């Protein structure tokens, strides 16, 4: 006979197994499209723009395989972005510790080369990329497959006759970012989008930047009911952990990312493609 005590005991024993099974085998394979519609005043005069953001791919077998990256790329294309931003961390640190096996960066880049957008695919590097062969693996592979890598660079783009600037920073974790120097490359008053890997840079972003886009945090990667985020790799705790963040007149979007680091688990933060819509016809989310 199953008594209440036995039921609670068995449920207590089963819960960690169910949690572990879901966090290891189910949530990492999910894929969401998360929509944001910020309305920064600094975008006044800018075009209506659909931005797809892919962050923290961390390519590694058997979880983030080239075939899975291809699936992500095809799903992104189906969302019809005007521009695709890759927010860093294509390499997977877990492979150094015998967890999974490395995916050659040439295969990751080949899978990402499926991405299509009228205004191009633009990437910054993350701390895992710099920490593994100083980023040269990613630079070479992305160049070979036509993916534009930006390191303290500025690019003037135009849609529907309306210009804007895209800035891409070097990795801040390794001190390779030059925000003042990159901002100085902006040559006119067209609105500015800043792409960086780590969101900690946001404390230094000036008011005239319309939107900052980052990854790095994985949204905490594990968010427990009743507990919240376990850990965010940031000097500012949970301040820039995830989502659309508005401070004063400044807007930041932090992607929860796609892959995993440390352990091959996700819980409460499913992998996501972020879609950001900017423009005069947008109904703001904040």
Enumerate the language-model features and the residues they cover.
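N-terminal secretory signal peptides and thylakoid transit peptides that target proteins
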Residues: 1-19
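Aromatic-capped interface at the extracytoplasmic side
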Residues: 20-35
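Beta-strand-turn-beta hairpins that frame and shape the catalytic cleft
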Residues: 40-51, 155-166, 246-251
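Membrane-embedded segments
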Residues: 48-140
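Active-site neighborhood of phospho(di)ester-bond hydrolases with catalytic His/Asp-centered motifs
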Residues: 54-55, 84-89, 121-127, 150-152, ...
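Active-site-proximal loop/helix segments of hydrolase catalytic cores
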Residues: 174-188, 195-212
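Conserved beta-sheet core of the metallophosphoesterase superfamily
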Residues: 199-275, 282-283
């Amino acid at each position: 006979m199953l008594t209440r005590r036995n039921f609670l005991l068995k449920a207590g024993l089963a819960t960690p197994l169910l949690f572990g099974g879901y966090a290891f085998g189910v949530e990492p394979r999910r894929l969401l499209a998360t929509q944001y519609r910020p309305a920064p005043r600094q975008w006044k005069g800018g075009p209506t723009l659909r931005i797809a953001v892919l962050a923290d791919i961390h390519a590694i077998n058997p979880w983030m395989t080239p075939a899975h990256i291809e699936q992500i790329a095809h799903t992104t294309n189906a969302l019809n972005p005007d521009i695709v931003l890759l927010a860093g961390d294509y390499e997977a640190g877990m492979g150094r510790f015998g967890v999974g096996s490395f995916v050659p960066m040439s295969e990751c880049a080949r899978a990402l080369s499926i991405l299509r957008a009228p205004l191009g695919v633009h990437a910054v590097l993350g701390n895992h990329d710099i920490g593994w062969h100083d980023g040269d693996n990613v630079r070479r592979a992305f160049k070979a497959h036509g993916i534009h890598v930006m390191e303290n660079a500025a690019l003037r783009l135009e849609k529907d006759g309306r210009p804007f600037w895209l800035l891409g920073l070097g990795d801040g974790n390794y001190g390779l970012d030059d925000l003042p120097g990159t901002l100085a490359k902006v040559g006119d008053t067209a609105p500015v989008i800043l792409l960086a890997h780590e969101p900690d840079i946001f404390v230094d972003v000036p008011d005239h930047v319309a939107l900052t886009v980052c990854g790095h945090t994985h949204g905490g990667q594990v968010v427990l009911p009743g507990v919240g985020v376990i850990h965010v790799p940031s000097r500012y705790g949970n301040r820039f952990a995830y989502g659309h963040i508005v401070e004063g007149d400044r807007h930041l979007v932090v992607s929860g990312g796609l892959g995993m680091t440390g352990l091959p688990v996700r819980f409460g933060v499913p992998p996501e493609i972020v879609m950001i819509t900017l423009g005069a016809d947008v109904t703001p989310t904040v």
